[in-house]
Amino acid sequence: MNTSSNLVRGFIGAALVLLTLQRSSLADSATWSSNPTSGDWNTAANWVPNVVPNGTSDTATFGSSSLTDVTNTLIIDLDSLVFEPGAPHYAITTLDNIRLYGNGVVNNSEVTQSFVAGAFFFKNNASAGNMTTYSSVGGFFSFENSASAGSAAFDLSSDSTPAYMFFSDSSTAADATINASAGFDVTFLDSSTGGTATINLSSAALVDVPGSFNAEHITINCIGGNQSLGSAVYLEGFSNAGEGTFTAVGGSTIGEHGGYIQVDNQATADHATFIIGGGLGAGLNSGILVFLQTATAANASITANGGVDGSLGGLVVFADKSKGGKASITLNGNSELDISDRNTGVTIGSLAGQGTIYLGSNTLTIGSNNQSTIFSGVIEENGGVNKSGTGTLTLSGANTYTGTTTVSGGVLNVANKSGSATGSAEVKVNTGTVGGSGIIAGATTIGTGSGTGAFLAPAIGTNKQAALTIQSALTFNSDATYTCTFKAKKNKAKADQVIANGVTINGAAVNLVGQTQGSLKRGLRLTLISNTSANPINGTFNNLPDGGIVTINGNNFQASYKGGDGNDLTLTVVP
C-alpha cells in the first residue's frame, strides 16, 4: 500500500471540498458597486448582485464607483475582468491568486488600469489586456495555453523569495512591456513566443529560455547588474531568437557587471540583432555574448561596441562546438571576438570594424554570407584565417596571428600601411583573388596547380593602379593568373606591380589590362613584378615568354624577365 500517495490524494480531496464550500457562497458574475461599503473584493455587499464573482465562467465588471482601491485576499477564478467604458482608474491589489480562464482582462475604459499583484494566472486565451499596468515585488505570473500578455506594462522585482513570470505552452508575450529587476526571473517554456514585447532587465534580473521558444520580434535589454551578477538572457534548448533585438549594456558603476547573453544547447540566433556594449566609464565592465555547446549564430547581426574612457569593450565568444553560421559581426572600438576556446575553427558570415580577435589555435573562416566588409582591427594568437564566399574582405590593420591565411573564395584585399595584413605565416590562394596595395609578410602561393582558378590582382575593385608588397617568396602555379592593369599616355605610364622576395612561375598566365592614349614613346617601361631577391625569376608566364611581344591598343610591348635591376618582369614599348 502506498501510504504517501493516499495521503496526497486525501489532502487534495479535502482541499477541493473546502474550495467548493467556499465558492458556493462566492460565485456568479457581478459588477463592483457604484457605492461599495469598503474596498474588499471578498465582501459580497460590495457587488451587484451581492455575490463575489468567483468561477471560471464568471465576469467581474468595474464601472463608475466611489471607491476604486480594491483588495483581494482569496483565490479568485474568473472568465474575465472587465472595465466598462467611462470607468475611472482602478488600483486592484491581490494578495492571493487571480486566475483568468476566458477573455482575461478587458479594458474598455479610456484610462490605464492598475494591478498590484501577488499572483496572476492567465489560462486558455486570456489576455493581460491593454492600457493595464501590473506591479509586483516577489509576485508570480503565469501565462498558459494560448494566453497573451497583451499590451500590458509590468514592473516586477524580487524580494527575499523567488519571483517569476512564466510563459508556457503556446502563450505569448505579445506587445507587453516588462521591466524586471532585483533578480526577477522571466521564463519562456515550451513553444511560447516573444511577439513584439519589450523586456528591460536590471539589477540581476533574468530571462531564461529552456524550451522551443521563438523570440519573433521581441526586444530584450540587459541593463547592467550588481557586483556578483549582471542581468542575463539564457537562450537554451531549441529556442530561436527569431528577428528579435537583444542588447547587453556595459556596466555603469565600479564593480557592476555588464549585461550577459548566452546562446546555448541547440539554440539558434536566427536573424536576430545583438548589440553588446562596452563599459560606460573608465575601468567598467562590458556586456558579453557567448555561444556554447552546439548553438549557432545563424544569420544574426552582431555588433560589439567599444568601452568609454578606456573601459572594456563588448565581448563576443564562441566556445565548445558552437557555430558562427552566416552571422555578420562588427567589432567597434576596443571590442573583442574570442574563438580561442572553440574545439575547432569557426565560420562566420562577415567581419567588420576595428576590434581585436583572439584565435587561440583555431582558424576563423570569414565570408559565408558573401558580404563585402572592411576590418581594420587586430587578429592575434596562433590560429589562421580563411576567406570564403564571393564577397570582399579588406584587412587594413597590422595583424599578428601566426597561422596560415587561405583564400578559398571571393577577394582578400590587403590594405595595411605597416606590419602584415595576413600575420606572419604563409598565404595560400586556392580559389578567389588576393590583391590590394598593402603588405604580406609570409610566402604567398597563387593556385594549387589543379584548381579552378586563383588570381593575384593588385588593383582589384579599384580604378587606379596598386603595388602589393610580399616580403617573402611568391609562387604562381599553373591554375593561377596575374591580372595586371596599367594606364599610359605618350611618355608616362603607371602599372600594377607586385613586389616579392623571390618569384617562381609554374605555367601560370598573365592578364594584361591596359588603357593607352595614342602612340607611346619608344623605350617607355612598365614594371609588373619587382623581384627583391638576388635570384632571377624562376619560370615564365605561359602566354608571355621572355622576349615576347604583346600588342595593346596598337602599341607593342616586349617582355623581359631580366628587366629593371636585372631580375624584374618588365614590359618595354618597342616599334
Give the positions of each predicted feature.
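N-terminal extracellular ligand-recognition/capping segment immediately after the signal peptide
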Residues: 36, 64-79, 401, 439-441
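A structural signal for beta-strand register positions
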Residues: 82, 275-278, 303, 392-394, ...
